[in-house]
């Protein structure tokens, strides 16, 4: 065995020598102790997070910090480092004698329990290697630390940091892993330790090569000698009362090598720093520079050596740690999104995060909808099976054959689930059966978003329907009809039979001779018999041929869909999806679903012009045959001529379902939600009508009537005016269909049975628009029902007729009260129509009927109530007006939010007239006049903003303006009556109107004059109210008499010679004539009356007219004035 490089004699000599460097260091320490600054700012990295407190623990053999024997270098490299490190007595093996210069023994401390790291602390195995080159001849590249003699002080027992007793070596653990605080190290109790340089290297076992085999004996010997040596490792741990001295500077520590050090692995960062010495209480503690592998340390430990460089580096470390945490969060979220993408759209798809989340949301909603629908179907099937007995099930299976299949026995491809609906900007429309990829009407999606792989293999496949349920196409039906027509017109059977019979006679005639023959007479007799029998046989054959063709067309050519069959499942699937699309407002997608539903029933819509022409001609022929009851009876035998009640019931139900779908498509086309021309719409209307008639009692009469009305609408819209008489026929059929079953017409169609509504529908000039026009007098109804739009137009027509009855009554009205009664009749009809024009809550379903589900139009009802109140005020029927006050006071929200001032003008005019026309108030209040002024302001704004107003707007403005003027006149007349009650004469000697009243009256009169420029019926009211204004102001009575005489004498002279000049100005009505009589008889001076008794005669005539008008209160006033003037004269009706 070779001699060890560190012998007993060498160690004694090294420890006995006095080191000059120790003396120099002690001298420097004494000089610099006076300059020690104990502030925390000198050591900024002392109390950072890596040096937080914790328990000190030793690294056991099984701990990650324990070094394996492979982590040591060769014994030749251990001797020099151990010789330089040991500054006191050491324990040697048995063969060696203890040195005499080591009087102090090292006290061994018991092992501390293993350290348990806290949360967030990662334990890193850090092997420690002490390198020492051979003493005699160092190898190249080996760094030899100087040897220092021991100081005169003795070694005190001190705890060892990171030291553990092992049978074959020792290990050091980094302070960051053991959570040792600087305050827990007894630095002041370690005297006698000289400042000796100690070179250590920490690297992973994977990057270090094992030592040679020849170095194993030395390795074991050295390990046995140094296992009890206390090693103090304190890299960069300092205290505030310590002094930091740099003894040895290693600028190239990141690249130096020793004899026993292998090259560091790539990617290993080297942390190299100067040898640091801590001096506290006469104790010198050497720090160890470490070589750290960055892959084995947490992020907050990578730059721990540079903590003392300043606070900027600390902030950078915190920023690095925060970025690392954010990176972990992002990585976790991205992993979950990738996992969600794999579940929803498959692993091969390439989607962004938003598309993945959108797909997931759509898929979840689809699953919820599918579960709900399956639960409903399950409950339906359970209830159906519970209601059937065993005998019914057996009979159904025996009669239905293979067509009536239960849901449990269906094929998987029929009952398979739908694919989830595509996203807004997602999958292409061909991926889902809910969209029509073949028609090209649905919007295509992006190719980067494929469908879910869970449904790629389960998509609905196009099944070949059974031959008996598919039926015949329309072009085949038309071809068969043409064939029958040709057989009836050309009669080929007669020609065929005639040729076959005449051929033998012609043949015998060619070879006969000139002589007589007895057989010739016999042949002549046989030909006469066949000629007599041939025509009936031919017509019988033709009749049989026609019957066979009709049976083939109506009985065996009609597609019949049995319940719970594959086509029925497909039909109801698309039907329910169409309901959802209608409720969502996606009318294009709803039309596509209805198109697919008809295709599932075996009734595909025509796709070419030829198919469209054939389908339209066939529907015309079929409707003509059904008018003769032949086609309707044959259609009732659809499915077969055998008496199968269940099959016929299923045929009627199939016809009903197809008719409802055709009708809904027709409604969508009429409202502009479905593309196509007039021929397409006519074909849809005829198809719905023919199938609804064939459905019989399977369809409700309200739905059948609605289909008739839709056909009448199509005639009104698409056909020329010469064929508009057909609308009367269809409306009559709808009325008969309603009365035949229940004896009552549905609420939505009652106005069609009224003479005014029937005349408006047939002769009115109106049109159905795809986008309903905004109106101030009604709200839009069902957006997919054209009948609701026509009802809305009729409501506005009724309101206009009621206003015109007051503004410009008919010239031939002999009765003065007729204008008010006609207006009230129109308003009553308007109230009934407004209950059926609004959009109902469940009107978007395919099976919903406008006749059964109706709503209310609050706007039309409010305008009707307001107009009725004004009419009752004009008739002086205040009790009837008071019953409508609550309806007028609550204006609808739609009218409150509108920007047009006309509804506000109407509301405040009602409030002002209600306050001023009350006969119980004699004096005007400022509040009532303020409301009146506000109403006048809104009315002027309405006249200024509607320069091109419609006729109904002008009629309403005339009514409101006249109402305000009448209210002001009534207030002035009550004041005059109260003042003149004290006088003896009938003429008014009371005070004139105030300036405020006159100014308001003149403003309203100016508005009336402005309205009369564009609306001619307002001119006659201008004359009357202008005369009233002159009377209120006390102006010259001459001009006032002329204005009143214009209203009095136009009515008498209008029946004379008439012409164009006489019709330029409208004639005054009975109400205007009565008002002029009262003003002239009460307020004109006696000088302007032609005779002494003319005043009494005028009052008597006014009383008779008022009695005709039904104004009982004004009649009582006239009688009282007559009693004062004539002394008991009474008025009798004449």
Swiss-Prot record:
PTM section of the record: Phosphorylated by AMPK, leading to suppress protein processing and nuclear translocation, and repress target gene expression. Phosphorylation at Ser-395 by SIK1 represses activity possibly by inhibiting DNA-binding.
A Pfam match: HLH
Cytoplasmic topological domain residue ranges: 1-481, 558-1134
Residue intervals of the bHLH domain: 317-367
Regulation: Activation by cleavage is down-regulated upon activation of SIRT3-dependent PRKAA1/AMPK-alpha signaling cascade which leads to inhibition of ATP-consuming lipogenesis to restore cellular energy balance.
Annotated Gene3D superfamilies: Helix-loop-helix DNA-binding domain
Sequence ranges of Low complexity compositional bias: 61-83, 424-453
Annotated site (Cleavage): 451-452, 480-481, 519-520
Leucine-zipper: annotated segments: 367-388
InterPro entries xrefs: bHLH_dom (IPR011598), HLH_DNA-bd_sf (IPR036638)
Tissues expressing the protein: Expressed predominantly in brown adipose tissue.
Transmembrane segments: 482-502, 537-557
Region feature (Disordered): 46-102, 116-221, 415-468
Alphabetized UniProt keyword annotations: Activator, Cholesterol metabolism, Cytoplasmic vesicle, DNA-binding, Endoplasmic reticulum, Golgi apparatus, Lipid metabolism, Membrane, Nucleus, Phosphoprotein, Steroid metabolism, Sterol metabolism, Transcription, Transcription regulation, Transmembrane, Transmembrane helix, Ubl conjugation
UniProt topological domain (Lumenal) ranges: 503-536
Region (Transcriptional activation (acidic)): 1-60
Residue ranges with Polar residues bias: 165-202
GO CC, alphabetical: cytoplasm; endoplasmic reticulum membrane; ER to Golgi transport vesicle membrane; Golgi membrane; membrane; nucleoplasm; nucleus; protein-containing complex
Motif (9aaTAD): 27-35
Family named by the database record: Belongs to the SREBP family.
Domain notes for this protein: The 9aaTAD motif is a transactivation domain present in a large number of yeast and animal transcription factors.
Protein's name according to its UniProt entry: Sterol regulatory element-binding protein 1
């Amino acid at each position: 065995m070779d001699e060890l490089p560190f012998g007993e004699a060498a160690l004694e000599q090294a420890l006995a020598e006095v080191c000059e460097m120790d003396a120099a260091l002690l001298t420097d320490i004494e000089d610099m102790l006076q300059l020690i600054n104990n502030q925390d700012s000198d050591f900024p990295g002392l109390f950072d997070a890596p040096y937080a407190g914790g328990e000190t623990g030793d690294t056991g053999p099984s701990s990650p910090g324990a070094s394996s024997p492979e982590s040591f270098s060769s014994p030749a490299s251990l001797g020099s480092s151990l010789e330089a490190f040991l500054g006191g007595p050491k324990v040697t093996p048995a063969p060696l004698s203890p040195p005499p210069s080591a009087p102090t023994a090292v006290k061994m401390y018991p092992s501390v329990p293993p350290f348990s790291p806290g949360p967030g602390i990662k334990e890193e195995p850090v092997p420690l290697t002490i390198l020492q080159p051979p003493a005699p001849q160092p190898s190249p590249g080996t760094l030899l630390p100087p040897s220092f003699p021991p100081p005169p002080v003795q070694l005190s027992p001190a705890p060892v940091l990171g030291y553990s007793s092992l049978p074959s070596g020792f290990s050091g653990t980094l302070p960051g892993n053991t959570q040792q605080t600087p305050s827990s190290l007894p630095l002041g109790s370690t005297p006698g330790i000289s400042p000796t340089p100690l070179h250590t290297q920490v690297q992973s076992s994977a990057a270090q090569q094992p030592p040679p085999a020849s170095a194993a004996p030395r390795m074991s010997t050295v390990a046995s000698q140094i296992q009890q040596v206390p090693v103090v490792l304190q890299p960069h741990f300092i205290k505030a009362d310590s002094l930091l001295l740099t003894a040895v500077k290693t600028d190239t520590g990141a690249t130096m090598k020793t004899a026993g050090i292998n090259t560091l692995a790539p990617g290993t960062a080297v942390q190299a720093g100067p040898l640091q010495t801590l001096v506290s209480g006469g104790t010198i503690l050497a720090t160890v520079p470490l070589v750290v592998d960055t892959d084995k340390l947490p992020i907050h430990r990578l730059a721990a050596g540079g903590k003392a460089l300043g606070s900027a580096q600390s902030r950078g470390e915190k920023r690095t740690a925060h970025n690392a945490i954010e990176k972990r969060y992002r990585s976790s979220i991205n992993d979950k999104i990738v996992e969600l993408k794999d579940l929803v759209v498959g692993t091969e798809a390439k989607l962004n995060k938003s598309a993945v989340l959108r797909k997931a949301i759509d898929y979840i909603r689809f699953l919820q909808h599918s579960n709900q629908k399956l639960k409903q179907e399950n409950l339906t099937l359970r209830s159906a099976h519970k209601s059937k007995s065993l005998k019914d099930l057996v009979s159904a299976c025996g009669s239905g054959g293979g067509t009536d299949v239960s849901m449990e026995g269906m094929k998987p491809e029929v009952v398979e689930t739908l694919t989830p609906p595509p996203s807004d900007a997602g999958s292409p429309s061909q991926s889902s059966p809910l969209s029509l990829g073949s028609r090209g009407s649905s919007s295509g999606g992006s190719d980067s978003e494929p469908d879910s792989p869970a449904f790629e293999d389960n998509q609905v496949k196009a099944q070949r329907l059974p031959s008996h349920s598919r039926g015949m196409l329309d072009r085949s039906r038309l071809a068969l009809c043409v064939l029958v027509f040709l057989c009836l017109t050309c009669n080929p059977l007669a020609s065929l039979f005639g040729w076959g019979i005449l051929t033998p006679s012609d043949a015998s005639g060619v070879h006969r001779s000139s002589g007589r023959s007895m057989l010739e007479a016999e042949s002549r007799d046989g030909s006469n018999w066949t000629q007599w029998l041939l025509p009936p046989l031919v017509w019988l054959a033709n009749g049989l041929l026609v019957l066979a063709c009709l049976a083939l067309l109506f009985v065996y050519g009609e597609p019949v869909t049995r319940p719970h069959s594959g086509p029925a499942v497909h039909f109801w699937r698309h039907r329910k999806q169409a309901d959802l699309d209608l409720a969502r407002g996606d009318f294009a997608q709803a039309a596509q679903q209805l198109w697919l539903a008809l295709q599932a029933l075996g009734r595909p819509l025509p796709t070419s012009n030829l198919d469209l022409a054939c389908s339209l001609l066939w529907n015309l022929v079929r409707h003509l045959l059904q008018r003769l009851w032949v086609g309707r009876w044959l259609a009732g035998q659809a499915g077969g001529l055998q008496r199968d009640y269940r099959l016929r019931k299923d045929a009627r139900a199939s016809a009903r379902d197809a008719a409802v779908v055709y009708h809904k498509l027709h409604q969508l086309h009429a409202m502009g939600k479905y593309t196509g021309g007039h021929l397409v719409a006519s074909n849809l209307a005829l198809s719905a009508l023919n199938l609804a008639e064939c459905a019989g009692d399977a369809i409700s009469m309200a739905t059948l009537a609605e289909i008739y009305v839709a056909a009448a609408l199509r005639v009104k819209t698409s056909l020329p005016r010469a064929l508009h008489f057909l609308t009367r026929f269809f409306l009559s059929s709808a009325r008969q269909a309603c009365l035949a079953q229940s004896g009552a017409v549905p609420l939505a169609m009652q106005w069609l049975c009224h003479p005014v509504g029937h005349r408006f529908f047939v002769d009115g000039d109106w049109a159905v628009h795809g986008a309903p026009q905004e109106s101030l007098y009604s709200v839009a109804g069902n957006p997919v029902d054209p009948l609701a739009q026509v009802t809305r137009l009729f409501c506005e027509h009724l309101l206009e007729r009621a206003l015109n009855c007051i503004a410009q009554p008919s010239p031939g009205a002999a009765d003065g009260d007729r204008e008010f009664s006609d207006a009230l009749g129109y308003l009553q009809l308007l109230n009934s129509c407004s209950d059926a024009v609004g959009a109902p809550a469940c009107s978007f379903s395919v099976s919903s009927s406008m006749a059964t589900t109706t709503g209310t139009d609050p706007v039309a009802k409010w305008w009707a109530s307001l107009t009725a109140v004004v009419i009752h005020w004009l008739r002086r029927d205040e009790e009837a007006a008071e019953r409508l006050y609550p309806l007028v006071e609550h204006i609808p929200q739609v009218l409150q939010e509108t920007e047009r001032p006309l509804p506000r003008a109407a509301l405040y005019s009602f409030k002002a007239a209600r306050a001023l026309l009350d006969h119980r108030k004699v004096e005007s209040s400022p509040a009532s006049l303020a409301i009146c002024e506000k109403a006048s302001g809104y009315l002027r704004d309405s006249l200024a903003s509607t320069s091109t107003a419609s006729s109904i707007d002008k009629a309403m403005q005339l009514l409101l303006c006249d109402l305000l003027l009448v209210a002001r006149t009534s207030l002035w007349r009550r004041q005059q009556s109260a003042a003149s009650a004290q006088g003896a004469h009938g003429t008014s000697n009371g005070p004139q109107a105030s300036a405020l009243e006159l100014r308001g009256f003149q403003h309203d009169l100016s508005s009336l004059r402005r309205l009369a420029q564009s609306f001619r019926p307002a001119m006659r009211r201008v004359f009357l109210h202008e005369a009233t204004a002159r009377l209120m102001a006390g102006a010259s009575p001459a001009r006032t008499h002329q204005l009143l005489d214009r209203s009095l004498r136009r009515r008498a002279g209008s029946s004379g010679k008439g012409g164009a000049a006489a019709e330029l100005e409208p004639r005054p009505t009975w109400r205007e004539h009565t008002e002029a009589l009262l003003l002239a008889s009460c307020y004109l001076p006696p000088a302007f009356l032609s005779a002494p008794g003319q005043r009494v005669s005028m009052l008597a005539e006014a009383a008779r007219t008022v009695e005709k008008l039904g104004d009982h209160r004004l009649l009582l006033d006239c009688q009282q004035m007559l009693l004062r003037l004539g002394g008991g004269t009474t008025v009798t009706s004449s």
